[in-house]
């Protein structure tokens, strides 16, 4: 998955294939995925629930690349590592947790600094 996403090198708010790849990976592992959150087409929220209550653990899946430099900042690695960590925790938690959830947030537009801020503002 990392090689695939690295080959895309999509710019801020254009991370269509990257967002689809990460959210499909999570969906295939039992996460409920909502795409287009916070008014951004490529943002997503993936949630795996063990039941009502806590703990709640969240992972941030960064996705965008730099114009002319590709993934020089490593958001491809952050995105894949976060999605894999979320999936691993969900799998581990099936036999351990009776409550709580794992959330993976696809956070676009990291390079301009507005993606996460928009997601916070929109709840």
Which residues fall in each region the model found?
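Fold-level recognition of mixed alpha/beta catalytic cores in primary-metabolism enzymes, strongest
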Residues: 98, 103-123
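Acidic/His- and Gly-rich active-site-bordering loop/insert found
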Residues: 1-103
């Amino acid at each position: 998955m990392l090689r695939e996403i690295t080959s895309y090198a999509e710019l801020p708010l254009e991370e269509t294939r990257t967002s689809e790849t990460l959210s499909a990976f999570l969906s295939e592992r039992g996460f409920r995925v909502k795409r287009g959150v916070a008014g951004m087409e490529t943002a997503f929220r993936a949630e795996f629930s063990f039941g009502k209550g806590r703990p709640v653990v969240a992972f941030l899946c960064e996705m965008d690349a730099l114009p002319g430099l590709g993934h020089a900042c490593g958001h491809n690695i952050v995105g894949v590592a976060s999605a894999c960590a979320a999936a691993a925790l969900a799998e581990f938690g099936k036999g351990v947790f009776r409550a709580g959830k794992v959330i993976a947030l696809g956070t676009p537009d990291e390079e301009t600094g507005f993606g996460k801020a928009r997601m916070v503002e929109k709840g």
